[in-house]
Structure formats: structure tokens, C-alpha cells
């Protein structure tokens, strides 16, 4: 962590002084508007992690912010005027700045709230979700920490701002966000008041849209090690509400230890123990894309890969399954414990080094022999393809045509 010591000040980071950031800040400062960085960019900068989009807080009302930015030729999108939020897009490549007016939430209705804009930085911090997201940073590097986020960041502690139950009632998704933040920033132990509130209010999770649940689940699974947070979710009776099929934390832990890179969908396949139709039902329930649904179904048990077969059989499996599915299945077998580390390395090397060839003939080669289009063409093509595949893909076009001409004509 970039430690500010007792001065509550850090050296300005490169992202704070890049041209796009300065253009946005200068547009606001030109008329004396105060602007401070806040949220994930500040948190991640203090941890020395890469940052993405930049959040900025200001007392200026959103219409005034838009006017000042547009006057400088900066593109502005009114992403949430009712809640005081606009998005500025500046720089090359484009950088997004979410600029939100300081506010107090007067009434909340789930995700929605009736807000009042004001100039009270402490009140704005008090309405945020977690203390580590409520640290303000001036452009000169001065930190403002009204709710103790710096101490929590140092201690790897994820804590709600104020009363956890109140924060969750404002948006139930914060239950899932809490565990995701535990996976990214926590110690693995959890904050007892936060966990107690999540446990008590888990029955509200079915009210969330499937898309929001899926987004949080995928982000959680993409953490470097999500298992401690998932175990907390299991202990707190939260995981069973959103994914009752998640029973294989042991296999997921092994997957994380052997995988070459994180893959949230492959990790999900390791976490659940279901057949293809059940995997498809999970994907439908979570509103996954068709591609993700097909991929998850393809990684369901029973696994169509025998890791003990010889290399010739592995090439045939790789040809039929495709490289991505073959690698995923090999990793799942290893995570299950049925493949040694050494054998896994061999299987992954086959997938890396062998390029499946293209079948050298097509239906037109059969019709050129005088066989009319129809089922006979397909049966003959399948016969040659099977011979070519079982022969380890060695036969070239001439050999395939010779084999074709030697086949007896199939029955109608």
C-alpha cells in the first residue's frame, strides 16, 4: 500500500497528472469548482494496483458540470442526472471520468433514492457502501478520510460505512459486493457485523435481477483467490441462495493452484457438480450469453476426455473438442485429482503445440464422382472422415480420394 503516513498526503500518481485527467480538472477549476477523486481509483492507487475509470466528486450541480466540460470541448454523457452523475470522456485512448455531485440520500427504494445535492463532503462519504471506497483525494495528493477507510485498507478490512443493515437495505446487491470486496481486499476472516447483516438479510437476494447477481458472481470468481470469500458465503448461508449447486470449493481451490490464468467460467465449472442440462439451466438462470451457456454445458460432468489415453487419442480428442474445451477439461480433471501435474503439463503441451488439420475433402469431391447430392454423400464423407481421423490425420487429399473411391457404395 502507498502509505501516506501521518500527513494524509501522497505523491500525485501518473494517472492524476495525465492530460485527460488534467483537462477535466482544469475545466472545473477554471471557475473555482472543487473536485476530488474518490472511490475505486483512490483505493486501488493506494494499494499500488492498476486503475480503470476515474470517479470524481464535486459540490457543483450536474448541469453546471456538463456546461463547464462542454465549454472545453470534452464529451459528456448524462448517465444519471437524477443522482447527480455525468460521465466525461477525454484523452486518447479514451478515459472515462464519472463525476458525481455531493449528495445526501433522503429516501431509498432499493437501488433508487431521492437525493439532495449539497456541499457536505462528510455526508457524501456517509452514504457510500464501504469505508475503503469513501476516501477522497485532492489533485495535489491530499487525502481526506472521514470514515476511517485508510485504517481499514491497511488492515485488509472490508467494512460498511455506518450500520451494515442500513447500507444493505439501500441496495441488497451490497451483500454480494461485500463478499467480492472480501475476495479482493479482505484478510479472509471477514468483518463480524458485516457478515451478520449479510446473513440476516440473505433472504432478500432473490429480489435482485439475475443479471446483477451474475455480474457480481463472475467478478468474485475472477479474484486471485475467491475461495475464502466463497467459504464465508457458504458459512453465512448466502451462497446457497444464489447458487445452490456450488458444492465443490475443494475442487475450485485445486483449480486455482494449477490454472495458467484465471478464468471465471472455468472456475464456475469447477465449483459446481452438475450434468449438461443442469449446467445449461444455471446459465439460463444467470442470463449468461449463448456462448457462455454452451461453454458451461460443455464442461459439465461426465467429462468427455480420458487423460490416460495415448497422444494419438489425445490429438483426436483435441480435434473433436477444440483447443479451449480440451484445455478446460484437462484442468478440471487435474483439479479433481485424476491427473498428475506432470500429465497435465503434457496435455496442455499437446493443446499448445498441435494444430488440428483441415479435413482435405468435401462433399463436392463426392458429387464429382457422379453420386447425386443427398444422404449418400454425407455417409460417404463421414466414412472417409472417420478413416482420416483414426489414422491420426496423416492422409492427404490424394489418399483420402483414393480411399473414397475404394469404398463400396452406401445403401440408400
Residues of each region from the PLM?
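Catalytic cores of the polymerase beta-like nucleotidyltransferase superfamily
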Residues: 1-412
Amino acid at each position: 500500500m502507498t502509505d501516506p503516513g501521518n500527513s494524509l498526503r501522497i505523491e500525485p500518481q501518473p494517472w492524476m497528472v495525465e492530460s485527460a485527467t488534467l483537462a477535466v480538472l482544469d475545466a472545473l477549476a477554471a471557475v473555482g469548482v472543487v473536485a476530488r477523486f474518490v472511490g475505486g481509483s483512490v483505493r486501488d492507487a493506494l494499494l499500488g494496483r492498476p486503475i480503470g475509470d476515474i470517479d470524481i466528486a464535486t459540490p457543483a450541480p450536474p448541469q453546471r458540470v456538463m456546461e463547464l466540460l462542454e465549454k472545453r470541448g470534452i464529451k459528456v454523457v448524462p448517465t444519471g442526472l437524477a443522482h447527480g452523475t455525468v460521465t466525461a470522456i477525454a484523452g486518447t485512448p479514451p478515459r472515462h471520468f464519472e463525476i458525481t455531485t455531493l449528495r445526501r440520500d433522503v429516501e431509498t427504494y432499493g437501488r433508487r433514492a431521492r437525493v439532495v445535492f449539497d456541499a457536505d463532503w462528510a455526508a457524501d462519504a456517509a452514504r457510500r457502501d464501504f469505508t475503503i471506497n469513501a476516501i477522497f483525494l485532492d489533485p495535489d495528493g491530499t487525502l481526506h478520510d472521514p470514515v476511517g477507510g485508510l485504517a481499514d485498507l491497511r488492515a485488509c478490512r472490508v467494512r460498511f460505512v455506518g450500520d451494515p443493515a442500513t447500507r444493505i437495505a439501500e441496495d441488497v446487491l451490497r451483500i454480494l459486493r461485500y463478499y467480492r470486496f472480501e475476495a479482493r481486499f479482505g484478510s479472509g476472516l471477514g468483518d463480524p457485523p458485516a457478515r451478520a447483516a449479510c446473513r440476516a438479510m440473505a433472504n432478500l437476494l432473490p429480489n435482485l435481477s439475475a443479471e446483477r447477481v451474475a455480474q457480481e458472481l463472475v467478478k468474485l470468481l475472477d479474484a486471485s483467490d475467491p475461495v475464502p470469500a466463497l467459504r464465508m458465503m457458504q458459512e453465512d448461508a448466502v451462497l446457497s441462495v444464489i447458487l445452490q449447486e456450488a458444492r465443490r470449493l475443494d475442487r475450485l481451490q485445486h483449480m486455482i493452484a494449477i490454472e495458467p490464468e484465471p478464468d471465471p467460467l472455468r472456475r464456475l465449472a469447477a465449483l459446481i457438480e452438475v450434468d449438461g442440462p443442469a449446467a445449461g439451466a444455471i446459465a439460463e438462470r444467470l442470463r449468461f450469453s449463448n456462448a457462455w451457456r454452451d461453454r458451461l454445458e460443455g464442461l459439465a460432468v461426465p467429462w468427455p476426455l480420458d487423460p490416460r489415453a495415448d497422444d494419438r487419442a489425445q490429438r483426436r480428442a483435441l480435434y473433436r473438442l477444440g483447443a479451449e474445451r480440451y484445455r478446460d477439461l484437462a484442468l478440471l480433471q487435474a483439479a479433481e485429482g485424476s491427473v498428475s501435474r506432470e500429465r497435465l503439463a503434457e496435455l496442455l503441451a499437446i493443446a499448445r503445440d498441435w494444430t488440428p488439420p483441415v479435413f482435405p475433402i468435401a462433399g463436392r469431391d463426392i458429387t464429382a464422382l457422379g453420386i447425386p447430392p443427398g444422404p449418400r454423400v454425407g455417409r460417404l464423407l463421414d466414412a472417409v472422415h472417420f478413416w482420416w481421423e483414426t489414422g491420426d490425420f496423416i492422409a492427404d487429399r490424394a489418399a483420402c480420394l483414393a480411399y473414397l473411391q475404394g469404398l463400396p457404395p452406401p445403401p440408400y
